[in-house]
Curated annotation (Swiss-Prot):
<keyword id="KW-0831">Ubiquinone biosynthesis</keyword>
<keyword id="KW-0949">S-adenosyl-L-methionine</keyword>
<feature type="binding site">
    <location>
        <position position="120"/>
    </location>
    <ligand>
        <name>S-adenosyl-L-methionine</name>
    </ligand>
</feature>
<dbReference type="InterPro" id="IPR010233">
    <property type="entry name" value="UbiG_MeTrfase"/>
</dbReference>
<keyword id="KW-0489">Methyltransferase</keyword>
<dbReference type="GO" id="GO:0010420">
    <property type="term" value="F:polyprenyldihydroxybenzoate methyltransferase activity"/>
</dbReference>
<feature type="binding site">
    <location>
        <position position="36"/>
    </location>
    <ligand>
        <name>S-adenosyl-L-methionine</name>
    </ligand>
</feature>
<protein>
    <recommendedName>
        <fullName>Ubiquinone biosynthesis O-methyltransferase</fullName>
        <ecNumber>2.1.1.222</ecNumber>
        <ecNumber>2.1.1.64</ecNumber>
    </recommendedName>
</protein>
<feature type="binding site">
    <location>
        <position position="76"/>
    </location>
    <ligand>
        <name>S-adenosyl-L-methionine</name>
    </ligand>
</feature>
<dbReference type="GO" id="GO:0032259">
    <property type="term" value="P:methylation"/>
</dbReference>
<dbReference type="GO" id="GO:0102208">
    <property type="term" value="F:2-polyprenyl-6-hydroxyphenol methylase activity"/>
</dbReference>
<feature type="binding site">
    <location>
        <position position="55"/>
    </location>
    <ligand>
        <name>S-adenosyl-L-methionine</name>
    </ligand>
</feature>
<comment type="similarity">
    <text>Belongs to the methyltransferase superfamily. UbiG/COQ3 family.</text>
</comment>
<dbReference type="GO" id="GO:0061542">
    <property type="term" value="F:3-demethylubiquinol 3-O-methyltransferase activity"/>
</dbReference>
<comment type="pathway">
    <text>Cofactor biosynthesis; ubiquinone biosynthesis.</text>
</comment>
<dbReference type="InterPro" id="IPR029063">
    <property type="entry name" value="SAM-dependent_MTases_sf"/>
</dbReference>
<keyword id="KW-0808">Transferase</keyword>
Length: 232
């Protein structure tokens, strides 16, 4: 059985044409992208690295990593977001290879092929996040690093990520997230270790509604990223 939630795919298919509109529903992704790319780049030095972006969507992160000098492959199961990503790279002149394939299927095809694997804002949209994490482990080379980001599962996260972001501030369309699919750092860490990865670092991402700015912080109550390593 494929680890794909077709309702989740349909949700992003419907919005795909606005993926690169910085004032659209995807504004938060555009706003946090520089923070995330810098954090990753500081840890792996993307230039010259072979990178896989799992759940790449319309290519916001994929393009940014390619601009840092990485050779990037982006995979997603959404046909419309991938079409948008392909079109946008013609405009931007950035070269990314995009494929419509699951992480699990690509792991069969390309084990231990990537220096870096990123899987950001994707785990909370699949039926079995641990399956994706295992696939990421299989695809990264020994000594390589895997980065995940998702949303914590607690009352504060519900208040900020769903009530605040979707209903009050309208940063995201209603129904973007399902609270039951949010993932605690302890769960993500445990799944990573079970897959064979070593957790190296964790950082939170906070939003100030007054300044409308995001920043990296020690607070992992809502959005957070983790850095993991496949030991050699």
């Amino acid at each position: 059985m494929s680890n794909v939630d077709h309702a989740e795919i349909a949700k992003f298919e419907a919005l795909a044409h606005r993926w690169w509109d910085r004032e659209s529903e995807f504004k938060p992704l555009h706003d946090i992208n520089p923070l995330r790319v810098n954090w990753i780049d500081e840890r792996v030095n993307l230039a010259g690295k072979k990178v896989l972006d799992v759940g790449c969507g319309g290519g916001i992160l994929s393009e940014a990593m390619a601009q840092r000098g990485a050779t990037v492959t982006g995979i997603d199961m959404g046909e419309a977001p991938l079409a948008v990503a392909q079109l946008h790279q013609l405009e931007s002149g950035v070269n990314v290879e995009y494929r419509q394939i699951t992480a699990e299927a690509l792991a069969e095809e390309m084990p231990e092929q990537f220096d870096v694997v990123t899987c950001l804002e994707m785990l909370e949209h699949v039926p079995d996040p641990s399956s994706v994490i295992r696939a990421c482990f299989r695809m990264v080379k020994p000594g390589g690093q895997v980065f995940f980001s998702t949303i914590n599962r607690n009352p504060k996260a519900y208040l900020f990520a769903i009530v605040g972001a979707e209903y009050i501030m309208k940063l995201l369309p209603r129904g973007t997230h399902d609270f039951k699919k949010f993932i605690r750092p302890s769960e993500l860490g445990a799944w990573s270790r079970m897959a064979g990865l070593t957790v190296k670092d964790i950082i939170g991402l906070t939003y100030n509604p007054l300044t409308k700015h995001y920043k990296l912080a020690a607070d992992v109550d809502v959005n957070y990223m983790i850095q993991t390593l496949r030991e050699e």
